[in-house]
Amino acid sequence: MKPVFLDFEQPIAELTNKIDELRFVQDESAVDISDEIHRLQKKSNDLTKSIFSKLTPAQISQVSRHPQRPYTLDYIEALFTDFEELHGDRHFADDYAIVGGLARFNGQSVMVVGHQKGRDTKEKIRRNFGMPRPEGYRKALRLMKTAEKFGLPVMTFIDTPGAYPGIGAEERGQSEAIGKNLYELTRLRVPVLCTVIGEGGSGGALAVAVGDYVNMLQYSTYSVISPEGCASILWKTAEKAADAAQALGITADRLQRLDLVDTVIKEPLGGAHRDFGQTMKNVKAVLEKQLHEAQSIPLADLLSRRFDRIMAYGKFSEQ
């Protein structure tokens, strides 16, 4: 797959194109230019490190939405075995913006649930761009309650711009579905591990992100509203999105300092989409450790800690 570069990555893109050209020349001729290729590759890596070491919140928001970033089904394929997808909310329909089912994690049976976006136009429409309707959240809750019944840990992956705001979704009780998930998740009598892998958009993300451990990938975001939405409300123009991103504190490091996130999972150089394999290794290592810890904590303490965490959301500082 040809890499897609964001606007602030254009200097990296130019070097990458030059490297590709030199590799083509070397393959098509007897000239050995490997030293020059290695020199440019090192220069590209150094440039990438430099750019990504000082990303602004707005730029991190762009990385979190990168079209080649791994989605929930990619994590399921890499981290789990024997995945059996479960469908439907038993009330209205099956929402393809939420995927989930039974699987094995290191041989242990678990329930995995997450948002799913699409790669191409057809799939994006089918998945509603990762924006669940009420039936998606009700499906997620049905799966998590099933996990509780059989004593299975729950692992969730969060990646959504937000809950779908359409008229039909509101008529079918979007806010009720989200609110019920928040209520039930605080009482779910099994370990719950949550990982934000891309966009963590408002209540649409929180509805499957109330857990004993909440993780964020290094270049993911988590916020009550998108920077563009915030800018449109406060400044009446989306052009102020960069200012909004700065004010909202959407980044993983910032949220960890506020004790809203347990672990910031390091991403490969250039972001998770540049090296799926390393990303999966990093995520798996964290989930293995947290699952072991969660299963050693008495259930009463686990539930108390989970409740205290969600009740701490919404605090603010006047500084």
UniProtKB/Swiss-Prot annotation:
PROSITE patterns named among the record's database cross-references: COA_CT_CTER
GO-annotated cellular components: acetyl-CoA carboxylase complex
Species this chain originates from: Neisseria meningitidis serogroup C / serotype 2a (strain ATCC 700532 / DSM 15464 / FAM18)
Domain CoA carboxyltransferase C-terminal: 39-293
Family: Belongs to the AccA family.
Cross-referenced InterPro entries: Acetyl_CoA_COase_a_su, ClpP/crotonase-like_dom_sf, COA_CT_C
Pfam families assigned to the protein according to its UniProt record, in alphabetical order: ACCA
Enzyme category, top tier: transferase
Stated role: Component of the acetyl coenzyme A carboxylase (ACC) complex. First, biotin carboxylase catalyzes the carboxylation of biotin on its carrier protein (BCCP) and then the CO(2) group is transferred by the carboxyltransferase to acetyl-CoA to form malonyl-CoA.
Protein name (database record): Acetyl-coenzyme A carboxylase carboxyl transferase subunit alpha
Quaternary organization: Acetyl-CoA carboxylase is a heterohexamer composed of biotin carboxyl carrier protein (AccB), biotin carboxylase (AccC) and two subunits each of ACCase subunit alpha (AccA) and ACCase subunit beta (AccD).
An individual GO BP term: fatty acid biosynthetic process
E.C. no: 2.1.3.15
One term of GO molecular function: ATP binding
Reaction catalyzed: N(6)-carboxybiotinyl-L-lysyl-[protein] + acetyl-CoA = N(6)-biotinyl-L-lysyl-[protein] + malonyl-CoA
Keyword Lipid metabolism: yes
HAMAP family reported in the protein's UniProt record: AcetylCoA_CT_alpha
Ranges in a coiled coil: none
Intracellular or extracellular location(s): Cytoplasm
Keywords from the named record: ATP-binding, Cytoplasm, Fatty acid biosynthesis, Fatty acid metabolism, Lipid biosynthesis, Lipid metabolism, Nucleotide-binding, Transferase
Pathway recorded for this protein: Lipid metabolism; malonyl-CoA biosynthesis; malonyl-CoA from acetyl-CoA: step 1/1
